[in-house]
């Protein structure tokens, strides 16, 4: 297909802007998660990076992946810690290295979105718009700079859609690749299961017989992995992970309010793109039904619906990061509609194009605002804690606390968790004898009862982040009561 010079210039401009915005994600990776953002309630900014990386961090700090009685999620989601272990082999334990890997996945997702749109009938301009929307997203920007799992899952899902586009009778490599990639996605994050139906839909549209082969490979791979884990010393950790993540009973009486809450919180994804996407969905159901013949369009809404059902099932127990996997499906559905409207109704196409342009401009301004108003409160607090611990060799060099694993990733000081533990906290504290406790704001009385064998002396107090209940990080020296009484 030949393009007019104006079209080529537009594509070049869009892709150049996307590239610049992607590269900006690598800037200032030591900076804190943005304060006063729409996603300030998300606790991933002070816990999750450390939790998911903990196995790799421990491997290098203490020589083994697992700490008995502690929170060991790698038994269920091993892909990320295995990848970080490879990276840390060259860099050492490093928060910046972990975040760089995550940002790299986010940038690769932008490239994949471009490729996916092209593979499913989108023009180069449509694909470039999709890439720019993802590159400019402040939601993706903020969470891609945390070394958590959601960004990797978005990449894996996009990769699966791209691989699925090559499926056809007689071609084996896409089937084998999907049979491998789906288990990898599920072993990256268990909730990625909600995205699998969208992938299977595309596969069914390409080659119905291929579904059986892919499902058989996925079932075999997951079955073998689970059997191996349950026969190993990681079985307790495996069961504990699912126990603490079990869903609460459904409160049918509150379903209506939860549904309204879900629709309202969709604004976390994007304040313009989200309502535009909902309008596009209604338009496709009422008029542009031709769009549903495109497997990518249907798969996008299946994926979004799958994640929405999962979030709704959690009732009110969820965080903004749970919505991150909605972003790419929303973008794909919107840009494919824009392309269709250019043929069917130029006035509506112009309106949607103007809306997306406004979204890109406002999103870019917000991203630049995050970079220009960056803060290092958590980073500076972590370095101060590291200096205090290093200066007191008499205290056992082991942190205890909910954010202990996060600080371990940031400082290289070993840590254990006080919040998640398959061992009684009192017994664990006596067994491991941590020298330091890190907590947020006021001490929890239940924890204090469990730590009654120690006296907690406050050593430092730091202003960190913007949540009222989590805005003071405190360091305590843990002195055994017997030692203190001498």
Predicted ranges, named:
Residues 4-9, 118-119, 171-172, 205-215, ...:
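Membrane-interface helix-loop-helix junctions at transmembrane boundaries of multi-pass membrane enzymes
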Residues 37-50, 60-81, 89, 96:
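Membrane-proximal lumenal/periplasmic loop motifs of glycosylation machinery
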Residues 22-28, 314, 337-339, 349-376:
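Transmembrane alpha-helical segments
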Residues 100-121, 159, 283:
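Transmembrane-helix motifs of polytopic, lipid-linked glycan transferases
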Residues 52-57, 196-197, 203-292:
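Transmembrane-lumen/periplasm boundary regions of multi-pass, lipid-linked membrane glycan transferases
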Residues 355-408, 414-415, 419:
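Membrane-embedded, lumen/periplasm-facing catalytic core of multi-pass transferases
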Residues 10-45, 218-233, 308-309, 360-363:
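Transmembrane signal-anchor helices characteristic of membrane glycosylation enzymes that use polyprenol
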Residues 102, 139-152, 319:
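Short acidic/glycine- and proline-prone juxtamembrane loop motifs at membrane-interface regions
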